[in-house]
UniProtKB/Swiss-Prot annotation:
Positions of the UniProt region annotated as Disordered: 1-34, 82-127
DNA-binding region positions on the chain: 56-76
Protein name: LexA repressor
Organism: Corynebacterium glutamicum (strain R)
Catalysed reaction equations from the record: Hydrolysis of Ala-|-Gly bond in repressor LexA
GO MF entries: DNA binding; serine-type endopeptidase activity
PANTHER family in UniProt: LEXA REPRESSOR (PTHR33516), LEXA REPRESSOR-RELATED (PTHR33516:SF2)
Oligomer status and interactors: Homodimer.
Encoding gene (name): lexA
Function statement: Represses a number of genes involved in the response to DNA damage (SOS response), including recA and lexA. In the presence of single-stranded DNA, RecA interacts with LexA causing an autocatalytic cleavage which disrupts the DNA-binding part of LexA, leading to derepression of the SOS regulon and eventually DNA repair.
Record-linked HAMAP family: LexA (MF_00015)
């Protein structure tokens, strides 16, 4: 077993536990449950095949875990046992440090696929550093505004050469007010957080607690958020809070 209780009288805090390691200093594979082994395989195979880790939901689906909190608990346990290393600043940045000696069928397939794949793209160390893990924070209205959901739902790995750098987040567009600008309902907009905008930039803005995406416009009559659909009227924006600048639009075909 990986976890051993200290005998009575041992030094340390009450209830403290020690993770068993092998003589060579590596974590003991015998400490892993079948589910934890499966989680390691899923993470490893995703990194090998596509160059970045799976999402919390993908791990849960593969390991038979219904809630994201259960997945988070298992990841913490694997980190404690020394099989994973996680970056606290990048929730999806997970590094499998030690693997059990036995290979699953899926991991063998992944290794074979890696050997046949061209050594470029996500496997290039320089390009690998250009991936941004962008949080999805809900839906944004483009038309009749709806309240934006401010909880992070997911993290998407996106090429930094497309979305750039900075504090980024993603929102899904709902409505047709930006149709003539090519931003359609169901599209995803990547937004760089910033409190100001330049003339003509597309922005995500909060108005009376509701969020919308529009073109920023300022003239002698005031500040406006302009739609790109003649059936919608400009919105006065003197009291609007600029959430950020839209830097990319993504669409599923």
């Amino acid at each position: 077993m990986a976890i051993e209780k200290k005998p009575a009288g041992a030094r340390g805090s009450r209830g403290s536990r020690t993770v068993k390691t092998l003589p060579n200093g590596k974590p003991d594979p015998a400490s892993l449950s079948d589910r934890q082994r499966r989680i390691l395989e899923v993470i490893r195979d995703a990194v090998v095949l596509r160059g970045y880790p799976p999402s919390i939901r993908e791990i849960g689906d593969a390991a038979g875990l219904q809630s994201t909190s259960s997945v988070a608990y298992q990841l913490k346990e694997l980190e404690k046992k020394g099989f994973l290393r996680r970056d606290p600043n990048k929730p999806r940045a997970v590094d499998v440090r030690h693997l059990p000696e036995t290979e699953s069928r899926s991991s063998k397939a992944a290794t074979q696929a890696k050997s046949k794949a061209p050594q470029a793209g996500a496997h290039d160390p320089e390009l690998a550093g250009q991936t941004s893990f962008v949080p999805v924070v809900g839906k944004i209205a483009a038309g009749s505004p709806i309240t934006a959901e401010q909880n992070i739902e997911e993290y998407y790995p996106l090429p930094a050469e497309i979305v750039g750098d900075g504090d980024l987040f993603m929102l899904q567009v709902v409505g047709e007010s930006m149709r003539d600008a090519g931003i359609l309902t169901g599209d995803w907009v990547v937004v760089r957080s910033q409190p100001v905008a330049e003339q003509g930039e597309f922005v995500a803005a909060m108005i009376d607690g509701e969020a919308t995406v529009k073109e920023f416009h300022k003239d002698s009559s005031g500040i406006w958020l302009l739609p790109h659909n003649d059936t919608f009227a400009p919105i006065p924006a003197e009291n609007a809070e600029i959430m950020g600048k839209v830097v990319s639009v993504m669409r599923k075909l």
